[in-house]
Amino acid sequence: MLVLDTNALFSLLSNPNQFGKKTQRLLGRAGDVYFSPVSVFEIAIKEMLGKMKLSHPLGDLLKEHELGSLPLRVEDALETYYLPSLVRHDPFDRLILATAKSRGAVLITSDRRMLDLGFDWIFDSTV
């Protein structure tokens, strides 16, 4: 199972060529590619603030790409307890990281702060 963080989801929806070759192959082979509703919320906020711009409405793009949505569960939120190194991270990132970890998924991201955590289940989308 692959989970796209907000940066990776935005890249997929706006310009998938930003992904590295390995990531493109990984996404092409994987049958289970998901996103968190937390990312949808974050993209919506950033679009309203003018920090991100999509070519079409977010809901339409999500349907077009046929990605799975992972519901946010209490278990996902509780997983943040077991990731104390994230306490000072962005709360959106913490929830997305915890969601991927609690489900045993690989998280796809280009976010250097997440990659620098050194977890083996976080994959650099630029590779």
Predicted regions and their residues:
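A generic structural signal for short hydrophobic patches within well-formed alpha-helices
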Residues: L9, V40, A77, M114-L115
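Residue-level signal for well-ordered alpha-helical positions
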Residues: N15-P16, K46, L83, D120
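Active-site flanking residues adjacent to catalytic metal/cofactor-binding acidic residues
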Residues: L4, F41, S110
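Generic structural signal for small/hydrophobic residues in well-ordered secondary structure
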Residues: T6-N7, I43, R73, A100
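Short, well-structured N-terminal submotif of metal-dependent ribonuclease cores
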Residues: M1-F35, M48-D60, R103, D116, ...
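Active-site neighborhoods of divalent-metal-dependent phosphate/nucleic-acid chemistry enzymes
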Residues: S55, L67-R112, F119
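General small-molecule cofactor/ligand-binding pocket signal
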Residues: Y34, L70, I122
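Short hydrophobic/aromatic patches at helix-to-coil boundaries
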Residues: E64-H65, I122-V127
